[in-house]
From Swiss-Prot:
GO terms for molecular function: ATP binding; coreceptor activity; identical protein binding; protein serine kinase activity; protein serine/threonine kinase activity; protein tyrosine kinase activity. It comes from Arabidopsis thaliana. The active site is at D426 (proton acceptor). This is Probable LRR receptor-like serine/threonine-protein kinase At4g30520. LRR repeats lie at residues 100-125, 127-148, 149-172, 174-199. It is found in: Cell membrane.
Amino acid sequence: MVVVTKKTMKIQIHLLYSFLFLCFSTLTLSSEPRNPEVEALISIRNNLHDPHGALNNWDEFSVDPCSWAMITCSPDNLVIGLGAPSQSLSGGLSESIGNLTNLRQVSLQNNNISGKIPPELGFLPKLQTLDLSNNRFSGDIPVSIDQLSSLQYLRLNNNSLSGPFPASLSQIPHLSFLDLSYNNLSGPVPKFPARTFNVAGNPLICRSNPPEICSGSINASPLSVSLSSSSGRRSNRLAIALSVSLGSVVILVLALGSFCWYRKKQRRLLILNLNDKQEEGLQGLGNLRSFTFRELHVYTDGFSSKNILGAGGFGNVYRGKLGDGTMVAVKRLKDINGTSGDSQFRMELEMISLAVHKNLLRLIGYCATSGERLLVYPYMPNGSVASKLKSKPALDWNMRKRIAIGAARGLLYLHEQCDPKIIHRDVKAANILLDECFEAVVGDFGLAKLLNHADSHVTTAVRGTVGHIAPEYLSTGQSSEKTDVFGFGILLLELITGLRALEFGKTVSQKGAMLEWVRKLHEEMKVEELLDRELGTNYDKIEVGEMLQVALLCTQYLPAHRPKMSEVVLMLEGDGLAERWAASHNHSHFYHANISFKTISSLSTTSVSRLDAHCNDPTYQMFGSSAFDDDDDHQPLDSFAMELSGPR
């Protein structure tokens, strides 16, 4: 018989508690809490059918979704953007999207997503852009959407939404763009605060007055036609004669039209056949897809003018739709007789295809025939920074700062991480594109000259845009990385002012040279006079001042005094700006150093007349007289005047 004492029992109970505590602690430590954003995104993915694997790298065991495709995160690693347009997604949109409370943009347009729009979207207080257009959503528009107090851009067009017109949308305070066209909504349309809204294609809606025609039905009385026999045979004969004559004319017109159409089609087929033979030396370029001219002709509707996205110095860019539904941008190069030969063109294509960075426009394909050169890029649904600066709603300050940093990182990659390095030579707002999540993407670098490590510059014909061209490039045709840095500085001024460089120059034409005037306002701490009025008071004054300082550093007259793009990125991110700004004051050219009377009097009459002639020179108008003053180069004023006279 076993006798259990009190002491033994206490020891056993203590051991039991210790064992249970150890098991609980082990379970707690071994099961790391899951990120609620990961759970929400996985639920969204599981509700969708993804035929092209666009969401394949969404890992349910991951704790950080910021590296996933189609996801944009804030600097604090919070999910702020979900963008998967034109991915052929189907299925339903999970209500778990309401758990992504930091979302600012949702872009799921041009898919086949069906079912009801989840009311949980109303739980996203920071949402600014919601685009569910061109899907198969049905049912009512959830009333909870009126709770999106930050919403500015709403597109639900081209779905199968029904029910009464959502009058509650008029209560969203900041809504500036609304498109509900081509659905099955009914009832009266209230007044909206949105600057732009579209309700076309909803057959059962009507204006708010008068209400009696808003029942959603159309009453039509039958059409009655009476024929009187009293008109006699003469009227019948006349009618028959007119009918025969009219029919003959119609048949003749149709015959002529058919003949012209046939001739035009044969001519087009002949052109297609002539252009459809790929150059033998340009076939099979790595990962680049080779298109035939006939394919691109079909994808762009015959290079229709309605599909033109933009026109530049290298040619037109057309919107295209591939056979699988993917949207692309097709650049059709002009003046190909002046382009390099097959070997040089092949080398440039290969180098461009290796320049892969999230802030660079990726080349995905090409077409090269004896008469055509075409490049195929991904379609950027939000256009260019230049167009967004002119559209409504205006880009907010945080977005402008994000664009500046993204563009700077793209140029840094071209300058310091490509081998051989690539010079863009036309950095401007029109060449900075915005993807579905408003991430800055540098475009048109694919047509830049490649810079060999053995060279410090490339001498060639001047290419670029007036107002963005660096002075040394304009005067000598010599470009370098610092040429791009100058253009980037002008881009920063465009982001600050909301104006193109030429528009900005006209604005300040009565106040002196553009950059000289900017520096003066900065010295006098009147930065607000430069700011885009569309920003209102929604900006950080310190950040604006810092960006302006970076712009002024980038646009210094001498290339050697401008920072490298790696330094520009650090300064925009808040590192090293103060030191660089202080060091810049050691350059006598940076601020006003007016030409002394002694210097001018020592010039010959010819030299003075040369200097006077530059009052109308573009470089003089940009830099002012301070551009002529520099002790570092020890060059006479005459040589500077010669440099500023433009390309020879």
